[in-house]
Amino acid sequence: MTNFRLNVLAYSVMLGLTAGVAYAAQPTNQPTNQPTNQPTNQPTNQPTNQPTNQNSNVSEQLEQINVSGSTENSDTKTPPKIAETVKTAKTLEREQANNIKDIVKYETGVTVVEAGRFGQSGFAIRGVDENRVAINIDGLRQAETLSSQGFKELFEGYGNFNNTRNGAEIETLKEVNITKGADSIKNGSGSLGGSVIYKTKDARDYLINKDYYVSYKKGYATENNQSFDTLTLAGRYKKFDVLVVTTSRNGHELENYGYKNYNDKIQGKKREKADPYKIEQDSTLLKLSFNPTENHRFTFAADLYEHRSRGQDLSYTLKYQRSGNETPEVDSRHTNDKTKRRNISFSYENFSQTPFWDTLKLTYSDQRIKTRARTDEYCDAGVRHCEGTDNPTGLKVTNGKITRRDGSDLQFEEKNNTAKSSDKTYDFKKFIDTDKRVIDDKLVLNNPSDTWYDCSIFNCENNAKIKVFKGNNYYGYDGKWKEVDLEIKELNGKKFAKIKDNDRKIKSILPSSPGYLERLWQERDLDTNTQQLNLDLTKDFKIWHIEHNLQYGGSYNTAMKRMVNRAGNDASDVQWWATPTLGEDSWTGKPHTCATTYEWNANLCPRVDPEFSYLLPIKTTGKSVYLFDNFVITDYLSFDLGYRYDNIHYQPKYKHGITPKLPDDIVKGLFIPLPNNSNSDPNKVKENVQQNIDYIAKQNKKYKAHSYSFVSTIDPTSFLRLQLKYSKGFRTPTSDEMYFTFKHPDFTILPNTDLKPEIAKTKEIAFTLHNDDWGFISTSLFKTNYKNFIDLIFKKQETFKVGGSGRGETLPFSLYQNINRDNASLKGIEINSKVFLGKMAKFMDGFNLSYKYTYQKGRMNGNIPMNAIQPRTMVYGLGYDHPNHKFGFDFYTTHVASKNPEDTYNMFYKEENKKDSTIKWRSKSYTILDLIGYVQPIKNLTIRAGVYNLTNRKYITWDSARSIRSFGTSNVIDQSTGLGINRFYAPGRNYKMSVQFEF
C-alpha cells in the first residue's frame, strides 16, 4: 500500500509540474509529428559536407546525430516515442555503463538474463527473454542460444555449454535503441517481446568542424575490480577519414554482498562466496572511409570483440548427489570460456537525390561468432589434499637416490633387535619419518618387472645400484634391505633403469599414489557464421499536401550454425615416482606404445576423442523486404505504416566423415530400425546410424512471415500528444528446436520440422504532456498476445530393441518432442517523465526530476505465470547540469517490489513432489540509491565518479533468483536449507570512477 501511495504521489507531482505551465509557456511553433517507429537499418550517418540540395529533414537528422555524440544531455526534453528508449554514447558515459546490464540499469520493464558463470544472456522484455528479444549490431542479428527445452534439460544444468547471447563493447557504441513490444519491422525474426539495437560509432560523430579527434579514457569499478582503458582516434585527410576505438578490460568475478566475509575454501552447492574468475575483454572498432565526391562514400569496417573468463567453478558439484547422501568434493572444475565476434563489412552510400531515393546504402557483412565453454576437472594440488599425488611419507630423490624428506636414508620399524645389521628384519609397512613418527601403510612395494627409474632423475651411471626390499616370503611386508644392480635400457630415445634381479621377493619402494593428477577436459563450441547483404533507401516527397518520409529496402543473408565438441584426458602435476615409461614387451623386447599396452595411463597415454556434436549443422537462408512510411496529414495528425516480408529456409548440412559426428546411441534405430540381430554388428550399426542421420538431414524447412506496424500520432494541442500502436512480430523456430535429437530410455527427444513460427501482437496507447521548456510526462497502457509458443511435451512411450545378438531385449523409451502449445497474454502500464525545474525559479536552473514506472501482469497457457516478467519497478531521478557543463550529478532511487509467489512457475514441481508450482527462492522488495557525478575542471578533461547501492542494502534481483536451478550440478544451492543462495546476491556498496582526456 505504501508503494502505491508513493507511486500516485510521484505521478501527481510530475503531472502538476508539467500540465500546470502548459498554457503559460506554449511555444509559438506548432507541434511536429515525427516518425515514431522507424526501421533502424537505414543509412543515418551522412557526411558533414552534405550537398546543398539535401532537404531540411535530412539536415536536421544529421544535426541531431552530431549533437547526440557531443553533449552531456542530448534530446532529454524531447517527448519519448511510444514504447521506445534511445540511449546515446553520452548518456551511457554519464551513467558509467560498463556492460549490457548497466545499459538498462535505470530503465523499467527491461532487464538482462543472468547465466551464472557465463555472465548475461540477452534481455527480458514484456514477459519473454533471450531469443524472443531481438538483438542486432549495425543491422546484423547476433548469435542465438540453443533454446530447445530438451537441450536445456539435458545439458544446461551442468555448465558444459556457453549457451548465451553475445554482448557488445559499450565504448564502441554510438547509440542503443530499445523497443518494447512486438516489432519485426526492424529486426525480422525474434522481435516478440522487443528488440535491442546497437549502432557503432563513426568518424563523422567526432569530426565536427575539425579534422582530428583524440581521446583516452581510464576507468575502474570496485564491484568486480575491473579496470579499463579506451583509446579513440579519428581523423580526416582530404577525401579519407578513419576511426579507431580500442578498449581493454581486466577484472574478476562480481563480488556478491558480504564477499570478503565468506569462506573461500568451501566447495560445492553450499558455497556462499562468488566463484573466482579472471575476466578479460578486448575490443577494436576500425572504420576507414573514402569520399570521392560529396555524394558518394565507401567504408571498410572491422568490429572485433573477445570476452574471456578463466577461473574455478567451486560451487559446481562434480558428484551428482541426492540430499542427505553427500560426500566431500575431491576434484574441482576449472573453466576457460570465451566469446569471440568478428564482423568485417563493406558499405557504399549515395546521397544524390533521384526519383527513387534521397539516400542509398548498400552493405555487405561477414560476421563470425564463437561461444566456447572449456572445462578441466582435476584436483588442485597445494590447495587441498589430492590422492593422485599423495606422499605423506615425504619421500624424495636426493643425489639420484630415494631418501626421507631431510635427505637421510629410509628407515622402517625393526622386527627383531639384533646388533648385526645384515640380520635385521624390518616391517616395511611401517615407515619412520624424520620426526620418529611411524607412518603406516603409505608406501607401495612393486615387482622389479613393473618398476622403471627415469635416468634423468635417478643415478644410472655404470655399476649403479639401488636399495630395495627383499621379503622373507613372496607375500607380506617383513624383510630386509638389499642393494641390487640396475640395468640400463633406452626406450624411444630416452634412458631408463630397471632392477636386474627378477626375484619375486624383491620389491621397489615408492609412494603408493600414482604420482600425477588425472585431468578430464572438454571443449564445446557453438559457432554462428553470417554473411549478409543489405540495401536501404530513403525518400522524402509530398503528395496532395501530405508529407511522406519513406524508407524501404531488403536483405539477403546466409547463416551457418554448428556445434563442435572435443574431449579427452591427460595428467598434470606429474611427480618423480610416476611411472615414466610404458616399458617393453617381455617376449619381443620392443617398447610398448599406447596402442600395444594393456595398461591405461593418463600421463603416458593422454586421450583426445574424435570431434562430435549433438546437433546437425544447419544453414539458414533469409530474404526480406520492408517498407516504412511516416506521412504527416496535418501538423496535428500523422501515421506510421510499416510492412515486412521474410522468407527463411533451413537446410541441414551433414557430410559423413567430415562433419563432427553425432554419437551413435542418440540416433541408432530412432526412425529406421536396426535389422534383426544386428545390434552387435558394428558395420550394421554404423550403416543404420548413417541412415537415420540422412533421414533427419533431408528434412528441409521453409517459413514465410508477414509483419506489420501501425502507429498514429495525434497532437490536439501544443502540449498534449496521443499515440496509438498496433504491431505484429514473429520468431521462427531455431534450428535446434526443430532438429535436436537425443535417444535414451529415460529421455528421448524427437525432431519436429512442422513447428509454426511464434507470433506476438502488441496494442499500446500512450498519453504525453510535453513542453519544450518544462519536459514531459508520458503514460502508456499496453497488451501483448503471444501464440504458438514452442514447448517440450511428453508424447508417448515406445519400445526399442536394445542389447546384442541373441539377447533380443526391448526397453520402453519415453518420447518427447517440441510442439506449438502455449498461448500467452501480458498487459501493463508504464510511466516515463522528466521535468526541468529552471522555469520554476532561477536558482533551480539546470535541475531536473525524472520518474519511471512499470507494472506488468501475464499468464500463458491459461493460468501459468510468465517467469520473465519483472516485479513492479520504479526509478526516481534528481539531476543537475551546470549551464556550461562544468559539473553535474544524478541521484537515482530504484525501488523494486517483491516477486509474488503466485507470479512464479516451477515446471518441475511434480517431479520434485512439491505441493504447488511456485518457485521457492524469490526476490524480496528492495530500494537502491545511486549517486553519479562528473566534473570538467578544464576543457579537455572530464572526471566521472559514482557510488552505487549507497546504503549498502543486501538484495537479490529476480533475474538472479530465477537463475537458480532446482537440479543439476551448476547454479544450484542447498534447496532444503538455502545455503549457497548468498552467492546470487548483488554487490553491496561499490564505486566507479573514470578519467577522460579529449583533444
Curated annotation (Swiss-Prot):
Every TBDR beta-barrel domain range: 209-999
Segments for region (Disordered): 26-56
Biased composition (Low complexity): 26-55
Motif window: TonB box: 63-70
Motif (TonB C-terminal box): 982-999
A GO-annotated cellular component: cell outer membrane
CDD domains registered for this protein in UniProt: ligand_gated_channel
Signal sequence segment: 1-24
Membrane topology: Multi-pass membrane protein
Keywords noted in UniProt: Cell outer membrane, Membrane, Receptor, Repeat, Signal, TonB box, Transmembrane, Transmembrane beta strand, Transport
Location relative to the cell: Cell outer membrane
Single GO MF annotation: siderophore uptake transmembrane transporter activity
Spans annotated as 7 X 4 AA tandem repeats of Q-P-T-N: 26-53
Sequence repeat residue numbers: 26-29, 30-33, 34-37, 38-41, 42-45, 46-49, 50-53
Pfam families (UniProt xref): Plug, PT, TonB_dep_Rec_b-barrel
One example of a Gene Ontology biological process annotation: siderophore transmembrane transport
Record keyword Repeat present: yes
Cross-referenced InterPro entries: Plug_dom (IPR012910), Plug_dom_sf (IPR037066), PT (IPR006970), TonB-dep_rcpt-like (IPR039426), TonB-dep_rcpt_b-brl (IPR000531), TonB_Hb/transfer/lactofer_rcpt (IPR010949), TonB_rcpt_b-brl_sf (IPR036942), TonB_rcpt_CS (IPR010917)
Domain TBDR plug: 74-201
Entry-linked NCBIfam families: TonB-hemlactrns
Family: Belongs to the TonB-dependent receptor family. Hemoglobin/haptoglobin binding protein subfamily.
Function (record text): Acts as a receptor for hemoglobin or the hemoglobin/haptoglobin complex of the human host and is required for heme uptake.
Additional detail: This protein is subject to phase-variable expression associated with alteration in the length of the CCAA repeat region. This mechanism is called slipped-strand mispairing. Addition or loss of CCAA repeat units would change the reading frame and result in introduction of stop codons downstream of the repeat region. This may be a mechanism of regulation and a way to avoid the immunological response of the host.
Protein name: Probable hemoglobin and hemoglobin-haptoglobin-binding protein 2
Source organism of the structure: Haemophilus influenzae (strain ATCC 51907 / DSM 11121 / KW20 / Rd)
